[in-house]
Curated annotation (Swiss-Prot):
The keyword Aminoacyl-tRNA synthetase applies. ATP binds at residue 649. A motif ('KMSKS' region) lies at residues 646-650. The keyword Zinc-finger does not apply. GO terms for biological process: leucyl-tRNA aminoacylation; mitochondrial translation. Its EC number is 6.1.1.4. Disulfide bonds: none annotated. It is found in: Mitochondrion matrix. This is Leucine--tRNA ligase, mitochondrial. A motif ('HIGH' region) lies at residues 56-66.
Length: 894
């Protein structure tokens, strides 16, 4: 009889009963060891593995989304350590930024104090979830020891002509009173943080020349094989590569130089009807000084929707088509992207062959004729009817890039578009009126912020010398300490002792730059600093960075696809270009494999009548025998509408991970969040389903006690190998175990399918439990495979693994952290043979799989010794006898 399972580990559904409290206590018992102690880093051929999750902003509270990222990261960290890698798994704090500054204003304190308090709270929360980080590598971006080197990177950019200051139209957040980069304004024209409608202003600002790296940023995306395709596509779209031509349109007014107009379709020149200029184009700016209506149009342009087709026709000025010599009207048009490429932005308008140009022409020149110069081409094999053909021909605009030029195209009439494009470019090029070019939509990175809580820009403005870089020996330029902040905006400009300095170049009185840097600069290089965090002379050692970069696995949200990830790629490539690190591939990409986890969504309850989002206090949760739990609205007795949506305070659907850990324990919470959904998918958070995880964890502990209780003095060597003389049950047990072990190992190493890891853990536990009940597998094999189970659950549920390992270690010596190798599956030495008499199976006989090789006489003799053999075979005259595969067939004379 099997030992009775300990009642301490029996499941309960009534709150945190004794068994669940035991799980919680186990997490507390092993917290110190699992977060700070073993396993030691391996020495597997000195291979390293750099696993990094995006470091958080220290708000003071970890939400479920944080928990998901850190559990994924920590599980991979533990797995690779068990596999023998020297794992780098650091954590730090993205500590500068508006939230800290705004919170400090509300509380009347220095943001540094608020930030430090929050970091302490969040470190405790990370430990409560048993996260094992390399705290000796911890960095905080608001520490002068860190931002000293953020300033050093800025100076290197400045030295290489990639940091510059110019007056530009900028995005102004009227709530937070600061400048926003283009990437920080959403499609509705709102600030990414405050949600305010963004205004346009002209200010002198600092920019970083990311556009110089646009070709490499675009090209190298194709080499990032382990990045999600949607992230790469978003970056491709943002970089916006356009292969086209710059055409010279002369201006029929000698006061202005020629217009450089960009187009991707020079074959449409015969149908061009206007030229559109960006609002910051020099011609537009010049005319705005003398035309009040244009000035007013420019001032109100920031209030127009992003897809506006409004335009302002410039009077008394025409552009000359370089091919047809026709004079064309010129418009100021908000849809033209400012500074599109190297030349001021100008595009040609072709209403007959471009949908946007068509809408613009209809709005600004209603009723005027629309020209076309390209028609669709139908070959003889086309099955398109004449009626359908005419309908296509009459459709305006005709936007296909493939077609045939019409009679309006003069000498090019009847020529295919691709041929005409090449010929037209050659003709214009011979006259000095065109050149092939690749342009990019991306614009230089605006980094100036008019706020206090950020990295000071290390520049001094001198009337004699202009912008002068702060000498490296004077870094860091420290933020002056403030007792408290009482207003939004930039307080640095009001602090005389900070602003007024001597020029480092000529010694004259000068003023320090009072803008601080965009916080995305801080996070654009932190993965380098983690590798050498105590270095006081440089950001990081070149050899150390070259050895461990790029990051092997980088985990974080897809919401950073354009901002953080693009900026990090730019800075990594720049640092490579100045020989700060070496990449044998030559592409200097910072992240080899990118893992973007799905959003965690909360259960949302809505009143079907009013549409109101309901709080838990407004609901009654009752048990329904027919279909489980039912939720009822207290006020009207109705059943609410239920859905899963992004967690928010307004929808009352948030979840506190700390409360979940307090109710169920860290291990159950970790396994639950891994089990609920594949990493890339949205996770619908439902805490009620965690009971299945709790039962499994209790089963693991109970199973450990029961297997060890088979024989008190049972002990096996730590070098114990799977026996070769396995019976059928042992063969099946061994093969099933190896199949699950292989699946789990590959789920970590190859597929990153951590939800199936938890599922396979459960199946392995059930496999051991079933074998224990049947008593068909020898005790030594049971213990050996129990050890393996306890070892491989360590990445996901470390304290349960430690608890079970402690029970095992009390009876025998073993290496509880070394990941087991997958063994070959085996075949049974025995085979079941069908004994067929006159065409019918009479009985089965199990024998050595080589039984038939003993020969006819030996086989018959053996079978006749069996009771069934004597019954069906004795005293019969054999007419025909066949032995084949697993069949022994007798045909007797009647």
């Amino acid at each position: 009889m099997l030992p009775r399972p300990s009642s301490r580990f029996l499941s309960t559904q009534r709150g945190p009963g004794r068994a669940v409290k035991k799980l919680i206590a186990i997490g507390e018992k092993w917290k110190q060891k699992t977060t700070r102690g073993p396993p030691k880093q391996g020495t597997l051929n000195n291979r390293s593995k750099y696993i990094l999750c995006q470091f958080p902003y220290p708000s003071g509270v970890l939400h479920i989304g944080h928990l998901r990222v850190y559990v994924i990261s920590d599980s991979l960290n533990r797995f690779y350590k068990q596999r023998g890698y020297n794992v780098i798994h650091p954590m730090g704090w993205d500590a500068f930024g508006l939230p800290a500054e705004n919170a400090a204003i509300e509380r009347g304190i220095n943001p540094a104090i608020w930030t430090r308090d929050n970091i302490a709270k969040m470190k405790q929360q990370m430990e409560s979830m048993l996260a094992n980080f390399d705290w000796d590598r911890e960095v905080t971006t608001c520490d002068p020891e860190y931002y000293k080197f953020t300033q050093w990177i800025f100076l290197k950019l400045f030295e290489n002509g990639l940091a510059y200051r110019k007056e530009a139209e900028i995005n102004w957040d009227p709530v937070d009173k600061t400048v926003l980069a283009n990437e920080q304004v959403d499609a509705q024209g709102r600030s990414w943080r405050s949600g305010a409608i963004v205004e346009k202003k002209q200010l002198k600002q600092w920019f970083l020349g990311i556009t110089k790296f646009a070709p490499k940023l675009r090209k190298h995306l194709n080499q990032l094989k382990d990045w999600p395709s949607n992230v790469k596509q978003m970056q491709k779209n943002w970089i916006g590569e356009s292969i086209g031509a710059e055409l010279v349109f002369k201006v029929a007014d000698s006061k202005f130089e020629n217009l450089i107009v960009f187009t991707t379709r020079p074959e449409t020149l015969f149908a061009v009807q206007y030229v559109a200029l960006a609002l910051d184009h020099p011609i537009v700016q010049k005319y705005s000084e003398v035309i009040p209506d244009l000035k007013e149009f420019l001032q109100k342009s920031d209030q127009l929707p992003s897809d506006t087709k409004e335009g302002f026709r410039l009077p008394d000025i025409k552009a000359v088509n370089p091919l047809t010599k026709e004079e064309l009207p010129i418009f100021a048009a908000p849809y033209v992207i400012s500074s599109y490429g190297t030349a001021p932005s100008a595009v040609m308008g072709c209403p007959g062959h471009d949908s946007r140009d068509f809408e613009f022409w209809q709005q600004n020149c209603p009723g005027e004729h629309i020209k076309t110069c390209i028609a669709p081409f139908f070959d003889d094999a086309s099955k398109t009817s004449e009626k359908e053909r005419q309908k296509i021909i009459d459709t305006v605009p005709f936007t296909s890039a493939d077609g045939i030029l019409t009679k309006e195209s003069g000498e090019y009439s009847g020529v295919f578009t691709a041929v005409a494009r090449k010929s037209i470019m050659g003709k214009l090029h011979s006259k000095g009126l065109s050149k092939n070019i690749i342009r990019y939509r991306i614009r230089d990175w605006l980094i100036s912020r008019q706020r206090y809580w950020g990295t000071p820009i290390p520049i001094i403005h001198c009337d004699n010398c202009g912008p002068v870089p702060v000498p490296e020996s004077d870094l860091p330029v420290k933020l002056p300490e403030l007792k408290g902040l009482d207003t939004k905006g930039n307080p640095l400009s009001t602090i005389d002792e900070f602003v007024n300095v001597a020029c480092p170049s000529c010694g004259s009185p000068a003023k320090r730059e009072t803008d601080t840097m965009d916080t995305f600069i801080d996070s654009s290089w932190y993965y380098f600093r983690f590798l050498d965090p105590k270095n006081t002379s440089k950001p990081f050692d070149r050899e150390i960075a070259s050895e461990h970069m790029p990051v092997d696995i980088y985990i974080g949200g897809v919401e950073h696809a354009i901002l953080h990830l693009l900026y990090s790629r730019f800075i990594a490539k720049f640092l490579g270009s100045i020989n700060a690190w070496d990449d044998p591939t030559g592409i200097f990409e910072p992240f080899r494999k990118l893992v973007t986890q799905g959003m965690v969504q909360g259960k949302t309850y809505v009143d079907p009548d009013s549409g109101k989002f309901l709080t838990p206090d407004e609901l009654t949760f009752v048990k329904d025998p027919s279909d489980g739990n039912t939720t009822i609205i207290k006020s009207n007795g109705k059943i609410p509408m239920v859905s899963y949506e992004k967690m928010s305070k307004s929808k009352h659907n948030g979840a506190d991970p700390n409360e979940c850990i307090l109710r169920h324990g860290a291990d159950a919470t970790r396994a639950h969040i891994l089990f609920q959904s594949p990493i890339a998918d949205a996770l619908n958070w439902d805490e009620s389903k965690i009971v299945g995880i709790e039962r499994w964890l209790q089963k693991v502990l109970c199973l450990t006690k029961n297997i060890l209780g088979l024989e008190k003095n049972l002990a096996i060597s730590k070098d114990y190998k799977t026996p070769t003389d396995l019976n059928d049950a042992e063969v099946k047990f061994h093969n099933d175990f190896q199949r699950f072990l292989k699946s789990i190992t590959e789920s970590f190493e190859v597929h990153l399918s951590l939800n199936t890891v938890i599922s396979d853990y459960m199946k392995l536990t059930n496999l051991l439990e079933s074998a224990l009940k049947k008593s068909e597998v020898r005790k030594e094999m049971m213990v050996q495979n129990l050890q393996k189970l306890v070892t491989i659950i360590y990445p996901a549920v470390p304290s349960i693994s430690e608890e079970a390992a402690e029970l095992i270690s009390s009876q025998m010596e073993w290496n509880q952290y070394r990941w087991p190798e997958v063994e070959r599956t085996t075949e049974s030495k025995f085979k079941k043979f069908q004994i067929v008499v006159n065409g019918r199976v009479k009985f089965m006989y199990t024998a050595d799989k080589d039984f038939l090789k003993s020969g006819r006489d030996a086989v018959i003799e053996t079978l006749l010794k069996l009771p069934e053999g004597r019954m069906y075979l004795m005293n019969k005259k054999i007419k025909k006898f066949v032995m084949k595969y697993n069949v022994i067939s007798f045909l007797f004379h009647k």
